[in-house]
Regions:
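Glycine-rich, positively charged N-terminal anion/phosphate-binding segment
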Residues: 37-54
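Short beta-strand elements of ligand-binding domains
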Residues: 64-65, 95, 115-117
Length: 407
């Protein structure tokens, strides 16, 4: 039984490093063009080079997303893009469009191509066709069940890898192919600029009664009729593995480093726990609780156990659940004194009970007994943005460890 790859989002160089530090086997990133995430910080050429070195030095992989649905005006620029990224050493490029796929095969035949979920990979015949053209992996559409994926795996070539989303936001449209944003805001979702109108509040208007807004659902705020819950499959690692998925993908290139650290860490531990003893494996609910400590919508298993029902949507609000705040990030740690140097992110005080998450280790809880500013003067509260503070911690930490506090 092959251990699947844990694939994490890297919306910036910092997030790429965080994902790798917290246990990702591979990270997918976007450049400043063609990557379908305008809202992400994305990578300059210099960032790409540094990120690739950071990953490869640690035996990890980096995939480059180039999965927009291009117009004629994009083609010449894409050729320049290929020539620029070709020598960098990416482990694969994600493509959704057949024309861009053909250009990649012609101009950089040595770079593996993964076919993006934007290509609606929902049946095995499509996958076989992509494989014949040279694809090494297809990213499955989110609209597939475990049963369908297992059948898919059986009917495709053994060397064709399967990647599937296991956690994160769900699009109401078919694997991200949506024109609501284009129609309502002029922002092209298939060029990476989606305004997420599926999360907006809607009411009903009857043609002969202009100006009379009626609730679609019995709620004074209207209803959020397109508003999906977030995907979460951490309770189903055995099913994910047994269905034949090669790479388990976490959504979220526009999420924070804290989000990436928490989600990657939880899935890393649960995957490793399963493979340590598959026969006697039982799910550790503490990891689900960990996933609830980031900003998220209520969770669902999506299509994995069949078509979603009314319980897969959130009808009354598009707000996130935010029960914890990131309050600081460890920059360095002195093992002799037990003192951590921390960059403050959110206000916290002496006497607060906090949790500290660490790369590849369990989190721990402690009380802030004392802290000083960078000059060594004792302080009662860390309330200045990006303030450097020093604090004794009760267990060893490393650079990149994060402090959080329940609201």
């Amino acid at each position: 039984m092959q251990k699947p790859e844990l694939l994490a989002p890297g919306g910036s160089l910092e997030k790429l490093k965080t994902a790798i530090d917290y246990g990702a086997d591979a990270v997918y990133i976007g450049g400043e063009a063609f990557s379908l995430r305008v809202a992400a910080e994305n990578f300059s050429k210099e960032d790409m080079i540094e990120g690739l070195k950071y990953a490869h030095d640690r035996g990890k992989k980096v995939y480059l997303t180039a999965n927009i649905l291009p117009h004629n005006s994009d083609i010449d620029e894409f050729e320049k893009f290929i020539k620029e990224i070709r020598p960098m050493g990416f482990d694969a490029v994600l493509i959704a469009d057949l024309g861009l796929f053909d250009m990649m095969r012609s101009l950089a035949p040595e770079i593996p191509i993964h076919v993006s979920t934007q290509a609606n990979n929902i049946n095995y015949r499509s996958a076989i066709a992509w494989h014949k053209m040279g694809a090494t992996r297809v990213v499955l559409a989110r609209e597939m069940s475990f049963k369908e994926i297992a059948e898919f795996r059986e009917k495709i070539p053994a060397d064709l890898e399967l990647e599937a989303f296991i956690h994160g936001a769900m699009c109401i449209s078919y694997s991200g192919r949506c024109l609501l944003s284009n129609y309502m805001t002029g922002r092209d979702s298939n060029q990476g600029a989606c305004a997420h109108p599926c999360r907006w509040n809607y009411k009903l208007v009857e043609e002969t009664r202009p100006g009379e807004y009626m609730d679609v659902f019995e709620n004074e705020r209207g209803t959020f009729i397109f508003n999906s819950k977030d995907l979460c499959t951490i309770e189903h690692i055995p099913e994910l593995v047994q269905s034949g998925i090669t790479s388990l993908k976490i959504e979220g290139r526009v999420k924070t480093s804290y989000y990436v650290a928490t989600i990657v860490g939880a899935y890393r531990r649960e995957i490793d726990r399963y493979f340590a003893d598959p026969q006697n494996y039982t799910f550790n609910k503490a990891e689900y609780d960990e996933l609830c400590k980031v900003s998220h919508r209520p969770y669902t298993t999506g299509f994995y156990f069949g078509k979603p029902d009314e319980n897969s949507q959130v009808y009354t609000s598009s707000s996130y659940i935010r029960d914890y705040d990131l309050i600081g990030i460890v920059q360095s740690y002195d093992a002799e004194t037990g003192i951590a140097t921390i960059t403050q992110r959110t206000r916290f005080c002496k006497g607060d009970e906090i949790e500290i998450i660490r790369p590849m280790q369990p989190y721990f809880v402690q009380t802030v007994d004392s802290m000083t500013d960078e000059n060594g003067s004792e302080i009662e509260v860390a309330n200045h943005a990006e303030q450097i503070i020093k604090m004794k911690v009760t267990e060893p930490v490393t650079a990149g460890s994060m402090l959080r506090k329940k609201k």
